[in-house]
């Protein structure tokens, strides 16, 4: 299964491009799933989703099916066999998950004298959309689709979402470590010694279930069959900055980038001075992008002059090279180079394309390395061989970070 995350600058046409990519896959005879958190009217504006008129599974209503992430075939008036569109209802997802958790925590709430909240009292909290998408990605990863296209928010929020499974799993391991669960037979004794109730078994079981589900999503994000497609409208300095920021974030968190789409490109050679100048700025920006992104394809999508109203509009908008699911451009892996024989050190090589020294910060804490690049930060567990070493320095050259480690004689096995 191929997975393509579509993101980019705000207002650049991400949803239109994601829908067109999904449609192109369905036209090739693939089984395609399109995931989006965009409102129903925004999806309907792409010409594929039929809004309330989209048929739903028998016995299910539109709200329930969307909130639960049940696939809604985009057929009927749209007439696109093989294409399934799921619009996530993050509000319904939040209420359902909150009530489920509250039910499981009933004993603890009774102990505190709390009055449980009812469904009608709940309103969606910030961040609910991200968790709804994580649950939808887990379900998609367990499906049998040939292609999954995910319509993500603008690039900063998108990269934060892709990094979320790893971050949440780290929090769970720190707050509810498996070692404490293993000592559950001693929990009554520990509770008496501490003078406070110990966490209930259901809490550890819930944490274990969350960790397993997050691991599935993390595996999907880190899969070699997963890539990111960036969408931007050239011509403004802001678009160029956003793409450079995206490159930094994807270099640190992944997945690999497979294509940059320059959207809404005007025809060249216009007799109108204003349009000619705007087209010239677009072409200059595209040239800069191709130089900056190296071997990553930069495909142009022409300005249609109107919003797409039906699938045929998307067919005309997206040509074969832009609509294909090309393989992501290979990136160097994170490797440990053994240079003890020459320099007495081990070197951890971390590719960070687009990174510059004044935006880079490194901090080692115990068995982890905190890497900050621009607005992004990732906490990396050290490979086991480096945990017995001390950091002696680091350098950034040509988009690759090299961190030098000196083996600690007191910890390093003798004879090695």
Can you annotate each of these PLM segments?
Residues 5-88, 152-170:
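Walker A/P-loop NTP-binding active-site region of P-loop NTPases
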Residues 39-42, 90-94, 154-157, 177, ...:
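Conserved nucleotide-binding/hydrolysis micro-motifs of P-loop NTPases
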Residues 55, 186, 214-357, 366-370, ...:
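C-terminal lobe/tail of nucleotide-utilizing enzymes
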Residues 78-80, 85-112, 120:
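Conserved P-loop NTPase-based nucleic-acid remodeling module centered on helicase motor cores
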Residues 92, 169, 409-413:
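Short, charged/polar, Gly/Pro-enriched secondary-structure boundary elements
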Residues 106-244:
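Phosphate/Mg2+-binding loops and adjacent switch elements
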Residues 342, 363-365, 397-399:
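Structural motif
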Residues 386-402:
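Short, surface-exposed loop/turn motifs with a glycine/proline- and acidic-biased composition
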């Amino acid at each position: 299964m191929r997975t393509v995350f579509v993101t980019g600058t705000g207002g650049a046409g991400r949803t239109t491009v994601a829908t067109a990519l999904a449609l192109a896959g369905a036209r090739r005879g693939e089984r395609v799933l399109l995931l989006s958190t965009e409102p129903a009217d925004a999806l309907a504006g792409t010409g594929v989703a039929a809004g309330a008129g989209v048929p739903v599974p028998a016995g299910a209503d539109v709200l329930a099916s969307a909130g639960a992430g049940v696939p809604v075939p985009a057929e009927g008036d749209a007439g696109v066999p093989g294409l399934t569109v799921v619009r996530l209802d993050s509000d319904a997802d939040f209420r359902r998950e909150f009530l489920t958790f509250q039910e499981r925590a009933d004993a603890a709430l009774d102990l505190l004298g709390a009055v449980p909240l009812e469904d009608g009292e709940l309103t969606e909290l910030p961040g609910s959309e991200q968790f709804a998408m994580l649950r939808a990605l887990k379900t998609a990863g367990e499906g049998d689709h040939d292609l999954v296209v995910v319509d993500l928010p603008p690039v900063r929020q998108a990269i934060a979402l892709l990094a979320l499974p790893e971050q949440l799993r780290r929090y769970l391991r720190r707050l509810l470590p498996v070692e404490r669960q293993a000592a559950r037979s001693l929990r009554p004794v520990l509770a008496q010694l501490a003078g406070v109730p110990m966490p209930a078994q259901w809490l550890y079981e819930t944490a274990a279930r969350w960790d397993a589900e997050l691991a599935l999503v993390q595996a999907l994000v880190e899969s070699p069959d997963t890539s990111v497609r960036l969408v931007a409208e050239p011509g403004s300095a802001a678009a160029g900055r956003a793409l450079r920021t995206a490159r930094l974030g994807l270099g640190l968190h992944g997945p690999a980038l497979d294509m940059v789409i320059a959207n809404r490109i005007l025809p060249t050679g216009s007799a109108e001075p204003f349009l000619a100048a705007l087209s010239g700025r677009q072409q200059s920006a595209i040239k800069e992008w191709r130089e900056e992104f190296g071997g990553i394809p930069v495909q142009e999508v022409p300005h249609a002059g109107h919003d797409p109203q039906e699938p045929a509009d998307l067919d005309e908008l997206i040509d074969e090279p832009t609509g294909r699911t090309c393989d992501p451009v290979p990136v160097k892996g994170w490797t440990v180079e053994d240079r003890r024989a020459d320099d007495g050190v081990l070197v951890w090589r971390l590719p960070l394309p687009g990174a510059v020294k004044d935006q880079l910060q490194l901090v080692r804490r115990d068995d982890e390395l905190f890497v900050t690049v621009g607005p992004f930060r990732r906490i990396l567990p050290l490979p086991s061989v480096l945990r017995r070493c001390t950091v002696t320095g680091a350098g950034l050259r040509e988009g690759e970070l090299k961190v030098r480690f000196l083996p600690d004689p007191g910890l390093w096995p003798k004879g090695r």
